[in-house]
Amino acid sequence: MNLIAHRGNITGRIEEDENRPQYIDDAISMGYDVEIDIRKVGDDLFLGHDTPQYKVDYNWLIDRKDKLWIHCKNVEAMEWFDSNREFNYFWHEKDTVTLTSNGSIWAFPGKQPIKNSIAILPEIFNDNISQCSGICSDYIQQYKTK
């Protein structure tokens, strides 16, 4: 099962650390994949959920590509990743599901059970995760032993 730290969170939401590069690296070093929010502004890529906060570059992304689930936050980011297909990326807003570039089913919170999907924040809706292939959570550590 894929265990994905939502914006780098492991044991609960720490909003001021979300999407911070070192926070992401900490989650990866603990063995988790990480969902990150990224946008393109001009020629630059930035991590950050609501605003561009942390500038990153191609090399930063490529060094972590096997552990990242990249949520494109604007069309420009989606176009950039579409030209750099080696990454696992997706776009969604309030869709029930979306397909990531690697073919995974990314399911909106509260929409489970969906066979072979990634459950997003299942703890919020007490989702049935028995058919999921992965979980993305702010509390991902609690799923490690389940």
What kind of region is each of these model predictions?
Residues 1-146:
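Phosphate-group recognition and catalysis centered on beta-loop-alpha active-site segments
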